Amino acid sequence: MGNILTCRVHPSVSLEFDQQQGSVCPSESETYEAGARDRMAGAPMAAAVQPAEVTVEVGEDLHMHHVRDREMPEALEFNPSANPEASTIFQRNSQTDVVEIRRSNCTNHVSAVRFSQQYSLCSTIFLDDSTAIQHYLTMTIISVTLEIPHHITQRDADRTLSIPDEQLHSFAVSTVHIMKKRNGGGSLNNYSSSIPSTPSTSQEDPQFSVPPTANTPTPVCKRSMRWSNLFTSEKGSDPDKERKAPENHADTIGSGRAIPIKQGMLLKRSGKWLKTWKKKYVTLCSNGMLTYYSSLGDYMKNIHKKEIDLQTSTIKVPGKWPSLATSACTPISSSKSNGLSKDMDTGLGDSICFSPSISSTTSPKLNPPPSPHANKKKHLKKKSTNNFMIVSATGQTWHFEATTYEERDAWVQAIQSQILASLQSCESSKSKSQLTSQSEAMALQSIQNMRGNAHCVDCETQNPKWASLNLGVLMCIECSGIHRSLGPHLSRVRSLELDDWPVELRKVMSSIVNDLANSIWEGSSQGQTKPSEKSTREEKERWIRSKYEEKLFLAPLPCTELSLGQQLLRATADEDLQTAILLLAHGSCEEVNETCGEGDGCTALHLACRKGNVVLAQLLIWYGVDVMARDAHGNTALTYARQASSQECINVLLQYGCPDECV
């Protein structure tokens, strides 16, 4: 067993050996056979020595004192530790080598003696295989058994007993009668339930243990309870708090940000060639932004997000016509089938199963059946119609998919409502702050009040609110849609009320008005019928395309021997805006980038910046002049703009990437 036990032994022993039969006769009191048949029966023993029958009586309310407070009885004939048979029990050195102990047991054999004494002993007992063969092991076990229920405080993981100092404890027990059974066998049944089994380290008989029983006449002493960690110091780490941390974070999701009007998990198809579907945490806020994150944790930390501006986007559902956005509180009944199925592939097999969004319901009837290839990393998703897409004004597309029809329709309804709300209040925050300035409002009003700007440049509709920057004209909202279809290389459309208007753009619009532009773009329109406010869209579109795209009504070039590029250089040097606009309308990109002769190497942009004319500089850039060009001296247009101290020209050149040599 190998355990070191400190105990007190105070038995009243009465041993009587039968000289004739070689056994001990029982006394008048009830007897009990202890250790008659145990595993130590096969150990080497002297022939004359036989197992002893003992009668142990312990007085009631017996308080034991420490061994140093007691004196040895005078009637003690000899020291029990000097007995060769007890030498292995009462060792002075409890850590004596086991081999030496076994050798001593084999050599020291003595005959039985007759004695009847009382001992008051306290010693360190080293229980091992050699100790198990000693004659006084029975008394030792009995004494230790009486001591254990009162002194055990805790039990280690390896089931090792630890008895505190005996001086600090006292005990009182009733009279215990250990009797011997008449049939010859015996066990310590009265105390077996109080003795915890200790694993033995012996290799000879590893299965030896005290047999447990349930019928115990003496009450079982309660073991000391382990202190719980409920009252531990707050300085240490609390694992329960750490486990509950994610739950506490759920209460503060999105703290410090706008509360989403709808949020949840959706599948999103990647834009790569693999076209895999991955789970995303999607939020829809009242600011007109649809944001998706890789996970809920990223949303809580507000990292790795991507936003979609719904103000310039639309939503589409496969197989359905776009419907008007309704209130978010109005229930929408989903159709059983939208008539369109599409084979798509998905990402991880388990990614289809996820928690639904907060404001959507889940129908178990509409859940797709589990795929037989769910354990694979990728599999094809067949005929899934719970998807929708968002298309931006630039043509970019985002594909999303919900778990059910109801959830998809709830997302579509919420997004459509937000798109409508964004369009109704589509003034940008920057334009709002600028329009609050009285000076800018007066500048825009002055542009509208200029000659010819009170009517649309193409259909004569009153009070136009839209403009074409490179043409320098104002137009109605219907004609502005047609101008958008021409492309930005022909017409750059902006709103007077919704877009930003920096100083250089306001100067361009103030320099070119509708009458000046029509004198150039409609210079040869004699005999043509110009559309009016009541004309159809087809008639307006036909006129606009003929006027700006085909240039059928463009005024002719002046008769001169100079090339168009040289004429443009001269018009720029003379700051002749009308002639420059006419030349730019007729010219090509090569002619616009023509340089001055005589080894100067200056382009029209160099000349415009030397003059500090931001209107001509801006028009030249819009018509394709090279902002990176250098003259014969290696100077860029920005160098001449700095020499002219024209901050407007400097801002325009830096905006379009002209190299800044001063940096």
Curated annotation (Swiss-Prot):
Zinc finger regions, C4-type: 456-479
Gene Ontology molecular functions: GTPase activator activity; GTPase activity; zinc ion binding
Xref: InterPro entries: Ankyrin_rpt (IPR002110), Ankyrin_rpt-contain_sf (IPR036770), Arf-GAP_GTPase_ANK_PH (IPR051282), ARFGAP/RecO (IPR037278), ArfGAP_dom (IPR001164), ArfGAP_dom_sf (IPR038508), PH-like_dom_sf (IPR011993), PH_domain (IPR001849)
PROSITE patterns: ANK_REP_REGION, ANK_REPEAT, ARFGAP, PH_DOMAIN
Region (Disordered): 185-216, 231-255, 359-381
Biased composition (Low complexity): 188-202
Pfam family, one: ArfGap
Residue ranges of every copy of the PH domain listed in the record: 259-420
Positions with biased composition (Basic and acidic residues): 235-250
Keywords: ANK repeat, GTPase activation, Metal-binding, Repeat, Zinc, Zinc-finger
Biased composition (Polar residues): 203-216
Start and end residues of each Arf-GAP domain: 441-561
Extra information: Encoded by one of the numerous copies of centaurin gamma-like genes clustered in the q11 region of chromosome 10.
Function field: Putative GTPase-activating protein.
Protein name as annotated: Arf-GAP with GTPase, ANK repeat and PH domain-containing protein 6
Native source organism of the sequence: Homo sapiens (Human)
